[in-house]
């Protein structure tokens, strides 16, 4: 006797099991799952794979997402501890790592996370040799460098989430001060994703009107409106959120979704993400820092050459020095 399925459906051709737009997320903590839900709701993938070592949590997260399948358009959600589940991914998002503790700087995390990267990156590259790797784990700039070295991939295909979120926070806070939506407030933060990041006040504008032309002291210590405090708030944001709720998740998840969309859809949008800066702005070492990058299907296809003023260039070099002082002593 035929089954209900056989009576209902007549197969005409065999299914094509190969995903065309597969994304893997390594790490199913708060950040990984925020990335997952953001990507699913934006319909960026036809398959989403989750990888983690905590098998019960991993299965629970997978089932929870699968049960929401009616509400998004990703046809397949899989999970596993073995990296074979990630095979043939277009993008692999790395969120795994030791979580930042209250009061702990991103740089203090680095050595704890190096060993984790060594355990996962070779398997990622083995199963998805043509992928782009998007590193989100902190300290993201140094870990992106480490992932690049371990992976053997072209530098253009290993990208750190970098200052994409810092710049979003910057624009939000500028918008709050002006009463304007952040999409209409333009401003960039470059350098380290963290305490030594560099705000480019010279380029901050609304509708093409540079705020520096309205007040040349904007963003300086002598600025009576205290615009400089906005950058201080950007730096303190993560620490404050961690103190209040234990971790950051939603904003970084949305930021990652933004980057993934630019890559998969070949949008060639410009984002401040972490990439190799050796040879730029007088940097002589192999360092990854955020600068404006054009993102498309090949990863970082171009960088935008910003005309930094003397103060901004000095701060950028200081940011590079901060990272180099940690990176040069790493053992991996």
Curated annotation (Swiss-Prot):
Q: So where does NAD(+) get bound?
A: 29-57, 99, 138
UniProt modified residues of type Phosphoserine? 301
Q: Tell me, how does this one assemble? A: Homotetramer. Interacts with RABL2/RABL2A; binds preferentially to GTP-bound RABL2.
Select a single GO molecular function from the record's annotations and give it.
Answer: L-lactate dehydrogenase activity
Describe the family membership recorded for this protein in Swiss-Prot or TrEMBL. Belongs to the LDH/MDH superfamily. LDH family.
Task: Kindly give the HAMAP family that the UniProt entry links to this protein.
Answer: Lactate_dehydrog (MF_00488)
Q: Where is the active site?
A: 193
Single GO cellular component term: nucleus
Q: Which reaction does it catalyse?
A: (S)-lactate + NAD(+) = pyruvate + NADH + H(+)
Q: Which organism is it from?
A: Homo sapiens (Human)
Q: Could you say which EC number(s) this protein's record lists? A: 1.1.1.27
Q: Which PANTHER family match?
A: L-2-HYDROXYCARBOXYLATE DEHYDROGENASE (NAD(P)(+)), L-LACTATE DEHYDROGENASE C CHAIN
Q: Show the Pfam families listed in the entry.
A: Ldh_1_C, Ldh_1_N
The pathway where this protein functions is: Fermentation; pyruvate fermentation to lactate; (S)-lactate from pyruvate: step 1/1
Q: Which NCBIfam families match?
A: L-LDH-NAD (TIGR01771), PRK06223.1 (NF004863)
Main location, first listed in the record? cytoplasm
Q: Name one GO biological process term.
A: lactate metabolic process
Where's it found, cell-wise? Cytoplasm
Name by which UniProt lists this protein: L-lactate dehydrogenase C chain
List ligand-binding residues for substrate. 106, 138, 169, 248
């Amino acid at each position: 006797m035929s089954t209900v399925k056989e009576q209902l459906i007549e197969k005409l051709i065999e299914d094509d099991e190969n995903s065309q737009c597969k994304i893997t997320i390594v790490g199913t903590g708060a950040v990984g799952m925020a990335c997952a839900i953001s990507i699913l709701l934006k319909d960026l993938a036809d398959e989403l794979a989750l990888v983690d070592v905590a098998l019960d949590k991993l299965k629970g997260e997978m089932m929870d997402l699968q049960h929401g399948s009616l509400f998004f358009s990703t046809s397949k959600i899989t999970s596993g501890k073995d990296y074979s589940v990630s095979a043939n991914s277009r993008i692999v998002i790395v969120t795994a790592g030791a979580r930042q503790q209250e009061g702990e700087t991103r740089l203090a995390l680095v050595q704890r996370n190096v060993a984790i990267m060594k355990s996962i990156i070779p398997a990622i590259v083995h199963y998805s040799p043509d992928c782009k790797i998007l590193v989100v784990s902190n300290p993201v700039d140094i870990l992106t460098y480490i992932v690049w070295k371990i992976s053997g991939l072209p530098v253009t295909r290993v990208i750190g989430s970098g200052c994409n979120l810092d710049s979003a926070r910057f624009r939000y806070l500028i918008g709050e001060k002006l009463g304007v939506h952040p999409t209409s407030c333009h401003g960039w933060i470059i350098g380290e994703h963290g305490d030594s990041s560099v705000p480019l006040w010279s380029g901050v504008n609304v509708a093409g009107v540079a705020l520096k032309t309205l007040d040349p002291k904007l963003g300086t210590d002598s600025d009576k409106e205290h615009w400089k405090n906005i950058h201080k708030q950007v730096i303190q944001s993560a620490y404050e959120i961690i103190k209040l709720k234990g971790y950051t998740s939603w904003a970084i998840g949305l930021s990652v979704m933004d980057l993934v969309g630019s890559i998969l859809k070949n949008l060639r949008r410009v984002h401040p993400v972490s990439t190799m800066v050796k040879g730029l702005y007088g940097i002589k070492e192999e360092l990854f820092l955020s600068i404006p990058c054009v993102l498309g299907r090949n990863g970082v296809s171009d960088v935008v050459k910003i005309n930094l003023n003397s103060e901004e260039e000095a701060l950028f070099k200081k940011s590079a020095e901060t990272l180099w002082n940690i990176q040069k002593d790493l053992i991996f």
